[in-house]
Amino acid sequence: MNPKNLSLSLIFILMFGAYAANADFYGRAPEVLPGTIAEMYTTAFWIAKMKAPDQVILSSSAILAMNDSYRSRMKADPFKDADKDRIPNQSDLNRWPGRYIVLPDLASMTPVQVSAAVKEEVGKDINFMRGKYSKNVIGLKSVEFKEFGNMLAIRYTDWELDRFEKEMAADTIGGSVTPLDAVTVCDARLRIVPTFTPEQVGLMENGKARWDVWNVNVVRIGSPVSVLHHSRSGGYVFVLSPEGYGWIKTEELAFGSKAEISKLSRPASFVVCTGDRVPYYSDETCTYAGGWFRLGDRLPLVSKSNPRLVAIPFRKADGKLSSEKAWLAKDADVSVGWLPYTRRNVITLAFKMMGNPYDWSMAWYGRNHETTVRDLFACFGFELPFNAELFTFFSNNNKRVVRPDEGKAEQYKAILANEPFLTIYTCGGGHCSLFIGENNGEPIVMDTNGYGYDKDGIRYEIRRWTLTDTSQPEYFLKTNFTFCELK
């Protein structure tokens, strides 16, 4: 053999061998996880355990009143006289920039004050991107938000970060800012960094945790937002949304009057998406999808007599808002009006998401532990807060704090004292799960689990919405936890 060809062959073998050695996927945890049994993975198993599966627990008006009550309490002194171990950890609440406990009232602020707020919030985004915002991540203590990499897990250079910062255009924010009214025309990602192309994500490590942490959340279709600033290219706008401050692609919203927006965001007659993701179509044949909406999203009905015909917010070429008609399939997974709040409906919705992957930052339009239960209960009208550590203050009817030093028996007793299907519990760092029952005296929950376990020398990753016992996450019984009873 030609020595040159031999050398090339050896190089190829070495390169391929090195690749193959690192090409294994992470082991998927089995469908039936430790601590559970196969029968549990059906809705029938849990419905059979319910005393009154079709009893309406709360009316829609009572649920909306709970939302109003929570917002009112948060505007006052929300944590006054609360157990110190029940009060949320500020580091968890502010893990990402742009969050707030109470929606800022821009109407009560002067243009100069709005400008100061915008400069501060955009500054937080810049600091976050440059690793100056957060020192560490609760639950991932070995990982710090100090530097980021792209989709190939290659660290960003200074000039790349400079380009992103230039796009944020902080230098163009004037001394006074007048908010513009707009509405999202699709489910829109709320970004910390206004990136240009799909590979420009914010990975925090080259490992299993390949989440894009340059994302805050997904803002629902038809959500009113206040536009406060635009990026240098005009490709993004900086907004105040129901999910926080952040950057939304300009093409994903439309400008309109408050009255026009209200008709779409607060409709009197509407359908709620009760499927994981439901398309809408351009005509009655439902051949070509025109878009989609997600669990808990609402769309106005064009006519009460036709539950298939909905109005969707549409961005015209000039950026202004228009309302267009769209069709739902005959078997579309939706509810006309709020879904009745029954135990059967809770577990049915929960099982529709079974197996969905864990998306910590919602950058893939997925869900994490908090947003899974938020979207689930949104179908009934609940507007749960952005962070699970605030859930206990939403219902405010269970102020119990369970501590590790009480021991496993007391911890189990405290969990099992709550009503299944209607109770969310939250443990250290804001991790939450939906309590659904017990197996041999041990609590069983549904959880979008970002963790895994070792067995016989093999690592199994869960990282999906599924059933589990209290062994996941492994720190659950080692931290304080609280409850949110939605009844």
Predicted regions and their residues:
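Bacterial N-terminal signal peptides
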Residues: 9-17
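Boundary regions of SH3-family modules and the immediately adjacent low-complexity/disordered segments
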Residues: 24-191, 197-202, 207-210, 240-275, ...
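Low-complexity, Gly/Ser/Thr/Pro-rich intrinsically disordered linker/tail segments
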Residues: 35, 41-45, 49, 62-69, ...
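Conserved beta-strand/loop element in small beta-rich adapter and peptidoglycan-binding domains
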Residues: 207-231, 286-305
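Second-shell loop/turn segments in exported
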Residues: 212, 332-337, 355-364
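...with weaker cross-activation on analogous glycine-rich loops/strands in unrelated enzymes
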Residues: 218, 385-456
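Glycine-rich catalytic cores of cysteine/serine-nucleophile enzymes that process amide/ester linkages
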Residues: 277-326, 356-367, 428-474
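Active-site nucleophilic cysteine motif
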Residues: 346, 360-391, 429
